[in-house]
Amino acid sequence: MEISKTLLLVVSLVAATCFLQAKAAGVYCSNPYTRCYRKYIQCPEECPSTTAMNSKYKVCYADCDRPTCKSQCRMRKPNCNRPGSACYDPRFIGGDGIVFYFHGKSNEEFSLVSDSDLQINGRFIGHRPAGRARDFTWIQALGFLFNSHKFSLEAAKTATWDNEVDHLKFTFDGQDLSVPEETLSTWYSPNKDIKIERVTSRNSVIVTIKDKAEIMVNVVPVTKEDDRIHSYKVPSDDCFAHLEVQFKFFNLSPKVDGILGRTYKPDFQNPAKPGVAMPVVGGEDSFKTSSLLSNDCKTCIFSESQTEIESVKSKIEYAALDCTRGASSGYGIVCRK
């Protein structure tokens, strides 16, 4: 009986210690371009950890740009109904909170974000059924230019979808790279300015560009239900595996451009018509690049020259941010009351 009491006491102490450790978890804001720089933010008791082996569980997330410097619980997958998202065929939600569609063209690349020190392009795939005036399109790949490096991720083409197969492919500076198919497995670039973390063992990752962006990515197919509802007429040899993406940006310059990037400009006027069910934005010629890893579009401002970067960049004055424009006043910062 005495042994049982002792064992019970030990178990209780261990459990209490684990609880206190979980309760004490938090996030340190290390990005110098965020409002909460060098602050340690406590995690909620409901989600005491920043990681989870089960992707269905919420984790602790501290938005170091928020003036309150508080954490919240969130899923680690793209939210296609929040600012910074690019999902479906393709539907974007800008930094200003406005929904718009940009169809582009199948098998061509377009600038999604172009800043002085960051370029993000998207490759569009799709097809045009007989009798249609335009292509049905989806984002199949992303290309990044950053710190003299080139990085890409893409959804591999497949005729039929299999959840047990990883459809993600990665390259870094022209070389294929492999990220172990294990939940929470991580890859870093040599200088640790790019990080890939698997949220699940297959088809879901978070890419972090140091001090610039966080990108949550899922690979999904065009399902039979999607095909039925939208009359895509998907061929039998391709389920159009594509990306669902949500971007979070830091320290964007006032001159940022690109299909999505320009919606973070402080003075941007979105051409999407309000009140329209599917507001479509054009301008393909302005955003088209010659390849996934090029910065040669008409509106591209990315430069690998530090001199040019400094001439374009301007210091962000957080105190002067205008939160009267809706969801975001620019610079990748979402304003909330």
Language-model segment annotations:
Residues 20-24, 41-42, 85-86, 91-94:
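Surface-exposed beta-strand-to-loop junctions
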